[in-house]
Amino acid sequence: TGEIYGNSAQISGNGILKSTDNGVTWSPLPSTLSASIPATHQFAYTWRALVHPQRDSQQVYVATSRAGLYRTTNGGSAWTPVLSSNALFSDVIVTRNGTLYAAFGAFTGTQGAIASRWGVFRSTNGTTWTNVTPPDMKNTVKRIVLAEVPQHPEQIFVLAETPDEGAKGSTIYRGEERFEWHSLWKYTRTSADTGTWENRSANIPMTDEQRGDFYSQGGYDLLVKVSPHDSNLVIVGGTNLYRSTDGFTSTKNWKWIGGYWKPTPSFDKYSSYKDHHPDQHDVLFHPTDPKQMYSANDGGVYVTDDIRADSVAWRDLNRGYLTTQFYTVDIPNMPGFETSRKIIGGMQDNSVWFQNDEEEPTTTPWQRVGGGDGAYSYFVTGGLSYSLYYSSQQGRVYYVRNGITGKESYRKRIDPIGPKDYLFINPYVPHPTDQNTIYMAGDNQLWRLNDVDLIPAGNTDSTLIGWDS
């Protein structure tokens, strides 16, 4: 448990949970619990718990944050440190022949400090370790993740955020272009003590699309996995998910298969790949069906029935998985809508959604209105029916004009040029009697839009039209 490197918060866990009935029930291991809350010991933040498949289930390895690698040989009753490091990021895997690999970034969380142990390490017994770090990996490396090659237990893939080294990708964050560098290696063990590294960083996915480049948000979302059915089918993930069918030996055979997507329509700056979600954390291949793969990300769990398809299709498996968090909700409060069951709401990391069912709102699917982190949203009088204001993070506000049947006539972006320092979920409110007027907080000022109808339909960016402060 514990998340040391969240997008918006650092959340202390409290130890490790164990199940002895195939995941039906879970119990905390007393040896990993902290006497204080929030927890401060070595198990307050863990990156991975690994049961050794070739030993019995009593042998478990745990990669921690700032406390290195720990091992238990008695099912968690007691733990022994086997590889110390104060690195913020760590990982551990085991190959099909029982060889263990551990990784530590050089980043400690303190600017300028270098971890006491960083790089990639190999062990055949879990107690003695050999440093096999790629020779061109530098002590600026941040997060490192590892993947076995199931068909070839002498091989692994290594993906890392490597500032100023490797493939340079960009994204748009708070209206500004941001850059990150990542590196990808393949390691082949050639003898008991030696191996060779192949740097495949030049083939990390990059596109000409907004939010199409490989980008991991400082290592927050970072994964690499190899299919157990085909050693050339390799998946990498950051904000987006990508598939290669030649092990990233070239730039010709990879596809963008999840996460963000090309802005459609152009005003939706946070369009998502259909039936998928940004910020990738893991994938799992089906053990017997070579086409089926599960994807875990900030939106939950998704599955595809054909990972090799030219256009990969996903199914959402989050029904009944009750983690949705609404920042705001609104219901119609206008003449003619007194008995309406319509609802609109902005969800944490899950867009703005709208329920348009007048009969039974508990059974009709909701409709996605806009992307990003859903924020303040309102029903208002407008046109021949009702209209909508909705917003996403950092003060982006939109207006949807509906026709007499309630169908969308047009939409436009309406937030003002000028304010820079918005709250992440930034408030604004329509005037109670003139709902073409809204008031909005921005920086240390109050802004007023005098008439939303002045802004042209289809506008896709911030505007000066109609605003004063």
List where the protein language model places each region:
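Beta-propeller blade termini and top-face loops
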Residues: T1-S469
